Design a protein with these regions (language model features):
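Hydrophobic/aromatic beta-strand elements that line small-molecule binding cavities or substrate pockets
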Residues: 101-103
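Active-site beta-strand-loop-beta-strand hairpin of nuclease catalytic cores
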Residues: 105-113
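Basic, Lys/Arg-enriched alpha-helical interface segments
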Residues: 2-98, 107-108, 120-156
Length: 156
């Protein structure tokens, strides 16, 4: 009840509208029975992501949240060379710079962020070979971690 009294004093403020939106979204999510998968960040991907400009973090964060609830954001595209839609890339432009985050949804109970980087234009839109090799190594690390997490889950 105190929440209603407090919110009533806000009038039509942006904060009230945002809380109303979150409340409705949470209710819909709970009623749908959807679960939110945890996000695991491989090695430096979280630190690298946090260095992106705030608007880029916001946009990519929302795309990752959609992956957590089993949806695919419109800006998420399969990364070429990884055989299908198991490894996806989010691309965001900001003030003339391009930022990318690569994640995988190939695991039933988790989303792994494999790499986050600012694209340096050396070869057009193509992802540099060094980054692709790094993503492959980190995907293997994610597979190993997921296997360990599954074994822990079976043991408990």
């Amino acid at each position: 009840m105190s929440l209603l009294v407090t919110r009533a004093g806000w009038g039509n403020s942006p904060a009230k509208e945002w809380l109303d939106y979150l409340w409705c979204f949470r209710h819909i999510l709970e009623m749908s029975g959807a679960t939110v998968k945890p996000v695991s960040w491989i090695t430096s991907s979280y630190k690298d992501f946090r260095e992106f400009p705030d608007p880029v973090q916001d946009a990519m964060g929302y795309a990752l949240y959609q992956a957590q609830i089993g949806l695919k954001h419109g800006s998420a595209k399969p990364l070429k060379g990884f055989g299908g839609a198991g490894v996806l890339e989010i691309v965001a432009d900001h003030v003339g710079d391009t930022f990318r985050a690569v994640y995988t949804v190939k695991f039933a109970t988790a989303v792994y962020v494999l790499h986050a980087f600012q694209k340096k234009s050396k070869s057009g839109i193509k992802t540099p070979t060094e980054d692709l090799e790094l993503i492959r190594r980190r995907l293997k690390a994610a597979e190993a971690d997921y296997k360990i997490q599954l074994e822990k889950g079976k043991a408990s």
